[in-house]
């Protein structure tokens, strides 16, 4: 069999299992109401939790940044691409999210995937042991693999099982790695226990707050701030393309940790820096997130979450007990989940079907993602539409 035929057979196998993923084309800015593939829809697919992706203040900051700095950075951060906009943003991120450390410093990355790879591959290596939650994001899984450390997977959210594994480990370097808000279930890690275990066992605790930053905690400062947690063992990763409404990610930790990443993190060193205009837009986003407007958006989002939980509990399917903007409705089979997604789409509602390997086999689901840009009328549309596709998919 030739190489192309091998791929064609692989794609046929994906189709047979109902697992092919397809992109949709947005013709308008990200928001609750969009034009997608030429059709008007209400979107419940994005991670734009605060509805900032098309905020005029961010758009203008992006445009002004491009006028000042041009369209690209021109190089890596260590070879000419580190602008004043990047430096200013890192100072702002350290001040905003670094309350857990006595000497916080931040490092900006082009993507969350790169930030997670940087933290794990630079802090761990051969001879180290990484303890990773069973439901961690793919970027944390890949970072652990690429680090060449020994990797132990502990049961999801099970701090007691993690404690037992840490007690049995004599590796000189240990890392506990966990999402804060888990992206497919919407539940929150036992962060206070994880911090205590990290300090008890002399381990780093790397937390990925992709779905908590901007939403949780006072002024949206994130999951650690929401729980009032502080520790020199913490390494905090935040994402800027979700609630912040722009792009990129960052790591905040003690200044010594960040300097180590600058010197050793390959996904920071060997890539072109993001355009400075992106950093300008993120700075504007931080100002909105921390403002009274940000508080109002978080309050509205909280009310939407409460209403959605009530809607999903009224269905005969299995809602996951989530108190966050990620509201999954577990259906089970790939085929039934795809049918439900298609029926919702026919009624102008974009609710994506999540299937393996993103979630375990037999737990395919609709992932309803809420935004402060949604209205209660949008939820009423969703509630009315759920009855038909869910019944048809049964």
Swiss-Prot record:
Q: What catalytic activity does the UniProt entry give for this protein? A: 6-carboxyhexanoyl-[ACP] + L-alanine + H(+) = (8S)-8-amino-7-oxononanoate + holo-[ACP] + CO2
Q: What family does the database annotate?
A: Belongs to the class-II pyridoxal-phosphate-dependent aminotransferase family. BioF subfamily.
| Biological function | Catalyzes the decarboxylative condensation of pimeloyl-[acyl-carrier protein] and L-alanine to produce 8-amino-7-oxononanoate (AON), [acyl-carrier protein], and carbon dioxide.
Instruction: Name one molecular function that GO assigns to this entry.
Output: 8-amino-7-oxononanoate synthase activity
Q: Which residues bind substrate?
A: 21, 137, 358
Which cofactors are reported in the record for this sequence?
Answer: pyridoxal 5'-phosphate
Question: Residues bearing N6-(pyridoxal phosphate)lysine?
Answer: 242
Pfam families the record matches: Aminotran_1_2
- InterPro entries attached to this UniProt entry: Aminotransferase_I/II_large, AON_synthase_class-II, AONS_Archaea/Proteobacteria, AONS_Proteobacteria, PyrdxlP-dep_Trfase, PyrdxlP-dep_Trfase_major, PyrdxlP-dep_Trfase_small
Q: Which Gene3D superfamilies match?
A: Aspartate Aminotransferase, domain 1 (3.90.1150.10), Type I PLP-dependent aspartate aminotransferase-like (Major domain) (3.40.640.10)
The cross-references to NCBIfam families, in alphabetical order and at most eight, read: bioF
> Subunit structure, briefly?
Homodimer.
Enzyme class per UniProt: transferase
- The record lists the organism as Burkholderia mallei (strain ATCC 23344)
| Domain of life assignment | Bacteria
Name of this protein: 8-amino-7-oxononanoate synthase
Documented EC number(s)? 2.3.1.47
Q: Which UniProt keywords apply?
A: Biotin biosynthesis, Pyridoxal phosphate, Transferase
Q: In which pathway does it act?
A: Cofactor biosynthesis; biotin biosynthesis
Tell me the GO BP annotations in alphabetical order.
biotin biosynthetic process
């Amino acid at each position: 069999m030739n190489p192309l035929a091998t791929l064609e057979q692989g794609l046929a196998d994906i189709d047979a299992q109902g697992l092919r993923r397809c992109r949709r084309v947005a013709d308008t800015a990200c928001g609750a109401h969009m034009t997608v593939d030429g059709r008007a829809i209400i979107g419940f697919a994005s991670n734009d939790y605060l509805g900032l992706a098309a905020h005029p203040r961010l758009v203008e900051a992006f445009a002004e940044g491009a006028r000042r700095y041009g369209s690209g950075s021109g190089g890596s951060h260590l070879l000419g691409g580190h602008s004043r906009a990047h430096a200013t943003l890192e100072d702002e991120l350290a001040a905003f999210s670094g309350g857990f450390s006595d000497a916080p410093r931040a490092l900006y990355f082009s993507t969350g995937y790169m930030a997670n790879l940087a933290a794990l591959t630079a802090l761990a290596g051969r001879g180290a042991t990484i303890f990773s939650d069973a439901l961690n994001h793919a970027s944390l899984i890949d970072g652990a693999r690429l680090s060449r450390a020994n990797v132990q997977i502990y049961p999801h959210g099970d701090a007691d099982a993690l404690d037992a594994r840490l007690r049995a480990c004599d590796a000189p370097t240990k890392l506990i790695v966990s999402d804060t808000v888990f992206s497919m279930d919407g539940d929150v890690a036992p962060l206070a226990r994880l911090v205590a275990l990290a300090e008890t066992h002399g381990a780093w605790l790397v937390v990925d707050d992709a779905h908590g930053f901007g939403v949780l905690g006072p002024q949206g400062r994130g999951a650690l701030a929401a729980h009032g947690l502080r520790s020199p063992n913490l390494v905090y990763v935040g994402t800027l393309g979700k609630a912040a409404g722009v792009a990129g990610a960052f790591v905040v930790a003690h200044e010594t940790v960040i300097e180590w990443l600058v010197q050793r993190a390959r996904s920071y060193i060997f890539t072109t820096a993001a355009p400075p205009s992106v950093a300008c837009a993120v700075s504007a986003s931080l100002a909105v997130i921390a403002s009274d407007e940000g508080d109002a958006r978080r309050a509205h989002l909280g009310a939407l979450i409460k209403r959605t939980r009530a809607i999903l509990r009224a269905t005969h399917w299995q809602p996951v007990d989530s108190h966050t903007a990620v509201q999954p409705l577990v259906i089970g089979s790939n085929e039934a989940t795809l049918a439900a997604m298609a029926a919702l789409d026919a009624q102008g509602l974009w609710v994506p079907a999540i299937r393996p390997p993103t979630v375990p086999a037999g737990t395919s689901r609709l992932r309803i993602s809420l935004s402060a840009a949604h209205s209660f009328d949008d939820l009423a549309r969703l509630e009315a539409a759920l009855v038909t596709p869910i019944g048809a998919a049964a």
